[in-house]
């Protein structure tokens, strides 16, 4: 099952947001801004093909009437505000996997981009900021590829990392390279194994893609029946690479329910359950695509009552601690969670518009997560200071209660 997940083609449904400084920088010429974004995404897509990832632009949001958040040269608060806005506003308007803020502001120091690491599919953290630096779009595209790489679990390259170019995409300094290093590929693989983000398994609808249609870019767009890439590289006998139409007699060219150009018979499982909270999906016999992922109702007990189902998963603090600090880690003692009452530094429940709010006593297990590494009595309250160090939504925080919006609420609360 894990190998099947790792081998599957991934799809990142991307929204790019241009801030108001971008609007003024290009003298309110929205056509030029959209053209620049399309050019950036074309290169971004090309870069990620080597990772078996298709990047599809499904939305462009241009802040013509002023910024929706406080955009400043300080990257950390700006990224946090952008993530909050994405969760509360953008996701409610447009289904997507990741959002990148393209800003005309000069970011602090030599910084031209910033993103959370290992955060793909997370409502608040699957975001990045990219400065529109340089006259050509090539370096901006490489910068966005770098920040997206962080979201996909890649860290900065070390001196020992190599690729086919003099420098690689995840170099700590800006590089014109289109190549990922061996370290980046290993980082990404480890991230997929440990986090298995599910949203990137879903292929975008052809009607969702907003960039101009191109036959030969591996993305199924309006007017196409298939797209197996450029003519010189297509290896799919079911698809005519020159026309992006199915070959004679073919019902399909790809998909979890497509085999040798024909629909797989009804009843064959195409998506096994990933946890006891998930439900298996089967082919219908009428489509190449696996039906929409379904799961058991939120709030159903799981893992021997250690947790409650939430969107197909069973989030518990123990597994979150292991993901952060590795095997041999457990949840810290209850007293550690009282740090979340402070409302200072990294110890809080909520952060909004650069302000942090302490947890109420009953909500301390919905703020920062605290873990203990086996036999380490020197640091009994370990924590991760980034946003992925917060307790996950849907996690059990008390008997009959789960974390929702950083509050410990009744498990049956909508």
Swiss-Prot record:
Residues 10-204 form the Peptidase M12B domain. Zn(2+) binds at residues 146, 150, 156. Its main location: secreted. Ca(2+) 2 binds at residues 278, 281, 293-294. GO terms for biological process: apoptotic process; proteolysis. CDD domains: ZnMc_adamalysin_II_like. Disulfide bonds join 121-199, 161-183, 163-168, 215-244, 226-239, 228-234, 238-261, 252-258, 257-283, 270-290, 277-309, 302-314, 321-371, 336-381, 349-359, 366-403, 397-408. Ca(2+) 1 binds at residues 214, 217, 221, 224, 227. Expressed by the venom gland. Its cofactor is Zn(2+). Glycans are attached at residues 7, 70. Binds 1 zinc ion per subunit. Snake venom zinc metalloprotease that induces apoptosis in vascular endothelial cells (VEC), without degrading the extracellular matrix (it cannot cleave collagen) or inhibiting adhesion of VEC. Has also fibrinogenolytic and hemorrhagic activities. This is Zinc metalloproteinase-disintegrin-like batroxstatin-3.
